């Protein structure tokens, strides 16, 4: 199924794509899903009942990572550790903008992604409580010190549902720190 994109705009460096249900009624409220990396086609089966919001950051290696870390290999860019600033933009201003444009059900907001996008979503649980569901598909939990951080820090969003999905062979074919991906 091909999604129809009803609105596209840039909010503080984040490319935003919005797909409304085809029967969108401005007098009704709708659950919404915010998806890092913006590939809404993964969620197309939900498109008739949910507002889908694709988010594409300017630099995913910076915006989806919690702290600075060296590159995985020589010649590759380092990880910038700007997830807090990204989430400040997302939950501080962009979410308000979306709520002014569309009828979002504040009690049914989901946020997630895959790989680094999933890492960022899980990391948001420790500082923000704006969403009721967080999901991570093959989240980059190999990220240095992330598992330790999760064990030692307090979660702020205690009422949030959390869905994690990882493959059983995460990191198997890597010779760098990706090989340390938790299963």
What kind of feature is each model-predicted range?
Residues 1-30:
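A domain-start/cap signature at the N-terminus of enzymes
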Residues 11-14, 28-103:
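Serine-hydrolase catalytic machinery in alpha/beta-hydrolase-like enzymes
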Residues 130-141:
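A conserved short beta-strand
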Residues 141-183:
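The feature captures the conserved acid-bearing segment of alpha/beta-hydrolase catalytic domains
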Residues 103-114, 134:
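Alpha/beta-hydrolase fold nucleophile elbow
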Residues 86, 115-118:
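Active-site loop->helix "elbow" adjoining a glycine-rich segment at hydrolase catalytic centers
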Residues 35-38, 55-58, 114, 137-139, ...:
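Active-site-proximal beta-strand/loop segments in catalytic clefts of secreted hydrolases
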């Amino acid at each position: 199924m091909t999604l129809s994109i009803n609105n596209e705009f840039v909010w503080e460096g984040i490319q935003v794509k919005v797909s409304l249900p085809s029967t969108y009624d401005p007098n009704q409220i709708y659950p919404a899903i915010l998806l890092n990396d913006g590939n809404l086609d993964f969620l197309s089966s939900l498109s008739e009942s949910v507002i889908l919001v694709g988010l594409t950051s300017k630099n995913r290696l910076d915006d989806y990572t919690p702290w600075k870390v060296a590159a995985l290999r020589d010649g590759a860019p380092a990880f910038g550790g700007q997830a807090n600033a990204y989430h400040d933009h997302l939950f501080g201003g962009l979410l308000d903008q979306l709520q002014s444009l569309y009828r979002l059900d504040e009690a049914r907001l989901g946020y997630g992604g895959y790989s680094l996008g999933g890492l960022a979503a899980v990391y948001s649980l420790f500082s923000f409580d704006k969403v009721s569901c967080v999901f991570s598909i093959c989240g980059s939990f190999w990220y240095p010190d992330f598992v330790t951080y999760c064990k030692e820090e307090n979660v702020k969003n205690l009422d949030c549902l959390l869905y994690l999905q990882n493959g059983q062979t995460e990191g198997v074919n890597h010779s760098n720190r990706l090989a340390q991906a938790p299963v």
